[in-house]
Regions:
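Long, terminal "pre-/pro-" and other extracytoplasmic accessory regions
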Residues: 2-207
Length: 207
């Protein structure tokens, strides 16, 4: 019997032997402990977000510049996903580019623009169904993720910290996360223009 199983059996035994008035008291203690753990988790999460934003503000390279560097590694490739990672020793942009049936993953130094480490490559068939469908849908639109970043930064009045693709009822959308001047994260969703030249429709909200 594992330690976890033993603990469960002991706890159930104590509850069975305890007088009726002791059970509500234990429940209250458990509820208080759960609330305390939740508050602690929220504090730790917020501290991690603050560190990430601080590292991002110090980055000399913009999101679009990192995308351009990654795309030049393979002529004709297009960015499908990009995120800022300030948790590593040196802050980097993690960029995924696609071309034909291949997907490359790059780490671009957020200060120097240098490529960190070796790129990894995978085949389209190796992706999960959602990611594969998004990449396939990217082939059907002319707008690039970098174009969506420009619009999102204007709409949310800030700097983009990440961008990705999202399927919305069969339609491809670009999702861009922007840090505004007040340090708030804004998510902007853009629908690529139709082939007849309709402009992008943007909607945004706080995260």
């Amino acid at each position: 019997m594992s330690n976890k199983q033993r603990f469960a059996v002991i706890l159930l035994s104590l509850l069975a032997l305890a007088p009726p008035f002791a059970i509500p008291q234990l429940s209250a203690m458990q509820e208080a402990a759960t609330q305390q753990e939740g508050a602690e988790d929220a504090r730790i999460h917020q501290e991690a977000v603050n560190r990430e934003l601080e590292a991002f503000r110090a980055a000399q390279l913009s999101l679009r510049q990192a995308m351009g560097i990654a795309e030049k590694r393979h002529a004709g490739s297009r960015t499908a996903d990009i995120s800022f990672d300030g948790a590593s020793g040196s802050p980097v942009y993690r960029v995924k580019t696609v071309q034909h049936n291949r997907l490359w993953e790059h780490a671009i130094d957020a200060k120097t623009g240098d490529t960190i480490g070796a790129e990894t490559v995978s085949h389209l068939k190796d992706l999960n169904p959602d990611d594969r469908n998004n990449v396939m849908a990217l082939r059907t639109v002319r707008q690039e993720l970098s174009d969506a970043v420009v619009i999102a930064e204007q709409v949310a009045s800030g700097r983009a910290i990440g961008g990705s693709l999202m399927d919305d009822n069969g339609k491809l959308n670009f999702v861009v996360v922007v840090v505004n001047g007040g340090g708030d994260l804004k998510q902007v969703v853009l629908e690529p223009p139709q082939t007849r030249g309709r402009g992008s429709n943007a909607r945004h909200g706080s995260r």
